């Protein structure tokens, strides 16, 4: 199977030749590590701050890594005193919806309070540009589809509320301090680096495409489909998947807009086309040539039937396009990464500690 790669260019109104030193918070994680590669390709100087609670030091292949928490005010003071950052990209957060319901204080502390500490350091050192990783979970249950930026934000879990609260704080910081930000609301991030250097290594894994491919490779006994009675053509939930490299391109364009003096803004990021759980499984079987073991379970509370993005505003204002986000391409890149992980584990069975931060790799089921 031929895998698609793509070279991106910014629209004419956004300059790309501005030298920059970027602080990437959470750069050892899934999306953050892909962003480091994109920024390095653009010639940026890079510093990553990550506590490695969910990220991996070996994913920080570009720039320097400072191991520590974004909630550590003393550490931030040292960092901002030592470096003159042009902007900050903030990827660090806890992202599991279920865990946010059972441990809301942990999520508000990590996602909201730690971001306040970061903003205080930025304000103290006159760093006034931030690209923030937000989420479609700020919208809650969809009132219409596809969902644009005008859709009411009514988050239904602490994870979504923590991100929504940060968005409100950022709007206030712009008005009070001139600290400009771009909030990027992902729908379903998926895929892996087209060149095979990076990919998903969540532990535990919660993203559907990665889980399906683990079932295809044999690292997982099966994939569980939660609910077959939704009001969709095949009865399973529909989601909008956007390639991680496309997300990084949106971050790059947002950064360039801020560096060029552009205003604060929020954008929805998605492919604009949804795929059902059953379609994802079928696509995985086509790409891998393997049968995916499937089990069926009841609906999960709070799962909407359909979540699809209207990303026209990002196209109009940033010139962004989801160029790699067709399901076949996403699946192909993710499968390439899954195969590379399996090969490493076959060559060195004890490599799971290094690859996955010491968590058990062979856990079966969901």
Where on the chain are the PLM-derived regions?
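C-terminal substrate-binding subdomain of Rossmann-fold SDR/epimerase-dehydratase oxidoreductases
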Residues: 211-366
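N-terminal Rossmann-like NAD(P)+-binding domain of SDR-like oxidoreductases, especially those catalyzing
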Residues: 2-192, 366
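Short, contiguous clusters of charged residues that form electrostatic/catalytic patches at enzyme active sites
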Residues: 74, 78, 113-117, 164, ...
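Residue-level signature of the cytosolic catalytic core of signaling kinases
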Residues: 68, 201-205, 273, 323
